[in-house]
Structure formats: structure tokens, C-alpha cells
UniProtKB/Swiss-Prot annotation:
GO terms for cellular component: cytoplasm; Golgi apparatus; nucleus; synapse. Residues 373-386 have a biased composition (Basic and acidic residues). One of its GO terms (biological process) is TORC2 signaling. Residues 20-72, 117-198, 360-391, 487-551 are annotated as: Disordered. This is Synapse-associated protein of 47 kDa. Residues 295-347 form the BSD domain. Residues 26-59, 117-128, 137-146 have a biased composition (Low complexity). The keyword Transmembrane does not apply. Signal peptide: none annotated. Residues 524-535 have a biased composition (Polar residues). The modification Phosphoserine is found at residues 178, 182, 433.
Length: 551
């Protein structure tokens, strides 16, 4: 029980001293009660020897300061020491009263780690009323002299008293807000206080900052170089230059050169050819109607494109027509194919020397064919009147006796020729109405050019048309020859059968007039071409009837 009380009291005293009591308090020996003063002396010696070497060194380094502190030691410290000594003696005497019972010795207190010495505090200005009197200073000096005999122990006591005195000025947080104390091995001046980076950390931070700056400078330089390259590229290769290059490549691909020459340049009759070619753009059908089937017309769009550009430069109507038709109605290639086919017809007519004739070099269309057919109808309509007059003249002539057999042969031959002529007229009218292109017959100017002209006519489809025109001319000539031959015959009228003959002739004439009126009601190309011939044969049929009556 006494050991526990001793330990508690010792710890209480150490806490009150505030670090000055860092000494081991050995247990009393218990040999005799008279050993109490010796025990107190041994306790003080042990306390002085148990002081931490580092604390002693610190106290030695501040000898003058320790002596001054010993002089200033307050009465409270001496009072505590006296109480400790008295308590120890009392406890020792108590042990004697209880007998010489062996009380186990108290275990030695482990050496507490020495607190690092506080750095030199700045001088605190003296506050009146807080300092002790001069007498107290003298007592403190005496106590300091007694403690000085112990050497390092006295220094430790002085420093402990100073700490106890300075603890009055420390806040309730026991100096947590103040700078921490540092021991002998704690670097303070070189590496700074807590919260500041140490040497290695500072080096790492500096290195990272330098790397970031280097990376930023690298990025800025790369961006500036890229911007300069882009500017140079834009200056060297502009959009307009690339467009011009593409346009030149397109022109080269189309014709190799720029615009070509107009098709009428270089010909003898240049003005007439130009007029005819420029007139093609006035009719829309010249561009939408393809060449007739079977015509061998060679056309290359790439080759003809420069020529087309040259023609459009002279003919604004052609450009307008192209804008209206391409590509809404017809494609670009077919547009120029149809147009250049008509141009080739005009050039061919100019080479043959027939340019300017009726139908030659004109744009082929249905209207042209209708105009030609109308002219033919008008010419044929005027022929029956001539036929009637010729019939009247023949009737007024003196009649001659005609042999029956010769008359029959002539009648059959005339009928067969009339049928052939009517059939040919029908075919010609049908071909003219169905044909899309009109041209006159072409005659060779010289025998040396005959083969070349025939070849050109075959390519352009003119050969068949020429043959048809020649056939029509032959038929007209045959009609004239037949009429001349019939005029040579004389009709002989004998009395006795004049009444019957006259009646027969009148009937025949009436029937012929009815047929003629029916033909006039429904005019056709074949009727127009055979009307005059039919009137002649009616007259001769009457003559044949009269001859039969005579027999």
C-alpha cells in the first residue's frame, strides 16, 4: 500500500515540477530509520545522475543562463523539495514502526524520454506586479548555490524552474500554436519549419514545373510551325488555281485545244452555207428528230464539241435552244448528233453545187414535205383542164378509120401503162408523206466525181430519194409521149349509126364525167396524176364503141 502511495505521490511531484524531475527515485533500503537523511541525499544524487545526457549538455551550453535561473528560482520549488524530503523520511520511519518487515522495493521508474529543449524564448518585457521581490531573489540565489554543488543536476533544476515560470505565459493549449521545440537531431534552420517542403520535395516540384514549361513551349512552337505551313500552302495552292487547272484538263479532254473552226469556213460559197446553218437553230424539230434509219452517219461528240462551241459563238439562238432542250427533253450527245446531221446535209449540197435549190440544204421537217405535196397537187389539178381541151380538139378533127386489132392493142398497152403510172404515183406520194427529209436529184458535174458523190449520197440517204425523183420525171415524160402518139390517130364517123353511136358516146361521156367528179371530190396523188389520162381514155373508148357499131 505504501509503495502505491509513494508512486502516486512521486508522479504528482514530477508533474508539478514540469519536466525538472526527470530522475529515477529509488526505493528506500529499510535498514534503519536513521537512514532517512541519507536516503534523501541519495535520492537527490540519483536524480542528478539520472538526468538525460542531452539535457545536461544543453544546460552546460547555457551555464550562465542556468545560474541566473537558479538565482531567480521561486520559493515554490524549494517548498516542494522540502516536502519530498519530509515525506520520504516519514515513510521511512513508518516502515520502522511496522517492524523490520521486508517490504519489496519499488521498481525503478523507466527513464522517460527527455523533452527537447525549448529554444531561447525572446525576452519578455517585465510586467509590474508579476516579478518577485529582492528577498526572494536572494533565496533563489542560495538555493541555486546549493544546487550548484550537484553540477549538472543543479542546471537541470534551474531550467526546470524556468520552464515552470514560463508556463504561466503559455496558452491553455500548452503551446500548440507556438513553434515546436526541436532536439539536437532535429534540423530547424536548414530545412524550415513544419508545413514547408523539405529539400527533396522542393527539388521534385521544381523539376515538374520545369518539365511543364518545356512541354508548353514545345506545343506553342509546333502550333506556330503548323500555322506557317498552312499559310504557305494556301498562298501557293489557291482554290482558283485548282479550278483553272481542272478546267484546262477538261478542255484538253474534250478536244485537245480550245474552240474549233466553224463548218462554213474554207468553202467557196461561205456566206450561203453560213446562212443555211444559222437557220437551223430556228426550228426545234432539227434537234429532237434523229437521222432516218439506215443512214450511215458517223458522229463523235468529243471531236464535234469544239466545232459546236465555234457555232454557238456565232449563233446565239443555238445556245438558247440548247439551254431549253438539254437535258429536259434530249441528251447533250443526241442534241448535237441531230444538229450536225443537218449541217452535213448543207455541206454536202454546197459541195455538189445544188445549194439554194428547192429543198436542198433545208432542214428536213414535215412542213417541207407538206409544202412539196401541196405544190404537186396544184400542178396536177391544172392538168385536167388541159386534158379536156386536148380531147375537144381531137373530137373536132376529122375522124379516121382505125383498125380494130390495132386499137385493141393500143388500148391494152395504154391501160397497163396507166396502171403502172398510178401505182408509182401512189408509192411516191406515200414515200413523200412518210419521209422526213426532202432533197432534189443530184447530177454529177463530171464523171471523175461520180463515185465520190454516190458514196456521199449513200451515207446521207439521198440515193433512194434521187431515184424516186428520177422515176417521177420519167413518168411525166411518158405521159407527154403517150399524148403525142394519140394525137396522130384520126377518128372516122360514118352516118347510119350516128344516133346510136352518139348516144353511146354521150353515155360514155356522162359516165366519164361522173367518174371525174368523184375523183375531184376525193383528190389523191394518184388521181391527180392520172386524171388527164383517164379523160383521154374515155374519149377513145367511145371511138372503139363507134367502130364496133360500124362493123
Amino acid at each position: 500500500m505504501f509503495s502505491g502511495l509513494t508512486n502516486q505521490f512521486t508522479s504528482l511531484v514530477g508533474a508539478v515540477k514540469g519536466g525538472a524531475g526527470d530522475e529515477d527515485v529509488p526505493a528506500p533500503t529499510g535498514d534503519a530509520p536513521a537512514a532517512a537523511p541519507a536516503a534523501s541525499t541519495s535520492v537527490e544524487a540519483t536524480a542528478s545522475s539520472a538526468v538525460d545526457p542531452e539535457a545536461a549538455a544543453a544546460a552546460g551550453g547555457e551555464g550562465l543562463e542556468g545560474e541566473e535561473a537558479g538565482k531567480r528560482l521561486p520559493k515554490s520549488a524549494s517548498l516542494v523539495d522540502s516536502l519530498v524530503s519530509e515525506a520520504t523520511g516519514w515513510l521511512g520511519s513508518a516502515k520502522g514502526w511496522l517492524g523490520n518487515a521486508s517490504i519489496p522495493s519499488m521498481p525503478a521508474m523507466p527513464s522517460m524520454p527527455s523533452m527537447p529543449a525549448m529554444p531561447a524564448m525572446p525576452s519578455i518585457p517585465s510586467i509590474p506586479g508579476l516579478r518577485k521581490g529582492a528577498g526572494a531573489d536572494g533565496a533563489e540565489g542560495a538555493e541555486g548555490a546549493v544546487a550548484g554543488e550537484g553540477g549538472a543536476a543543479a542546471s537541470g533544476a534551474v531550467s526546470g524552474g524556468e520552464d515552470d515560470d514560463k508556463s504561466r505565459y503559455i496558452s491553455a493549449t500548452e503551446g500548440a500554436d507556438s513553434h515546436p521545440a526541436s532536439g539536437g537531431g532535429t534540423p530547424t534552420g536548414d530545412e524550415g519549419q513544419i508545413g514547408q517542403g523539405k529539400g527533396d520535395e522542393v527539388k521534385i516540384t521544381t523539376k515538374v514545373t520545369q518539365q511543364a514549361k518545356h512541354f508548353g513551349s514545345f506545343l506553342s512552337s509546333a502550333i506556330s510551325k503548323a500555322g506557317s505551313k498552312i499559310k504557305e500552302t494556301v498562298k501557293d495552292n489557291t482554290i482558283l488555281d485548282s479550278f483553272n487547272k481542272e478546267q484546262e484538263a477538261f478542255i484538253k479532254g474534250q478536244g485537245g485545244v480550245g474552240n474549233g473552226a466553224a463548218p462554213w469556213i474554207g468553202h467557196a460559197n461561205e456566206a450561203k452555207i453560213k446562212e443555211e446553218i444559222l437557220g437551223l437553230s430556228q426550228d426545234r424539230r432539227n434537234f429532237v428528230r434523229a437521222p432516218p434509219a439506215g443512214v450511215d452517219f458517223e458522229f463523235s461528240y468529243d471531236t464535234a464539241y469544239p466545232t459546236a462551241i465555234a457555232i454557238m459563238a456565232e449563233d446565239k439562238a443555238l445556245e438558247t435552244m440548247r439551254f431549253e432542250l438539254v437535258p429536259k427533253i434530249i441528251t447533250e450527245e443526241n442534241f448535237w448528233r441531230n444538229y450536225f446531221y443537218r449541217v452535213s446535209l448543207i455541206i454536202q449540197a454546197a459541195e455538189l453545187g445544188t445549194l439554194g435549190a428547192d429543198g436542198v440544204g433545208q432542214a428536213s421537217s414535215g412542213e417541207d414535205a407538206n409544202e412539196v405535196a401541196t405544190k404537186e397537187k396544184k400542178s396536177k389539178t391544172a392538168e385536167p383542164a388541159k386534158g379536156d381541151s386536148s380531147v375537144k380538139a381531137i373530137a373536132e378533127q376529122p375522124k379516121a378509120v382505125i383498125e380494130p386489132e390495132a386499137q385493141e392493142c393500143d388500148v391494152q398497152a395504154a391501160k397497163s401503162k396507166a396502171k403502172a403510172k398510178a401505182q408509182a404515183g401512189k408509192e411516191l406520194g406515200q414515200k413523200i408523206s412518210e419521209s422526213e427529209f426532202v432533197s432534189d436529184d443530184f447530177q454529177a458535174s463530171s464523171e471523175s466525181d461520180l463515185a465520190e458523190i454516190q458514196d456521199g449520197m449513200r451515207k446521207l440517204g439521198i440515193d433512194s430519194m434521187t431515184q424516186q425523183a428520177l422515176a417521177a420525171t420519167d413518168e411525166e415524160q411518158w405521159e407527154k409521149d403517150l399524148e403525142a402518139e394519140l394525137k396522130d390517130y384520126e377518128v372516122v364517123d360514118e352516118g347510119g349509126t350516128g344516133g346510136d353511136g352518139g348516144g353511146g358516146r354521150r353515155k360514155g361521156r356522162k359516165a366519164g364525167e361522173d367518174d371525174t367528179e368523184a375523183d375531184e371530190d376525193e383528190p389523191t396523188i394518184s388521181n391527180l396524176r392520172t386524171r388527164s389520162t383517164n379523160n383521154d381514155w374515155e374519149e377513145y373508148a367511145d371511138l372503139i364503141e363507134d367502130t364496133d357499131d360500124l362493123k
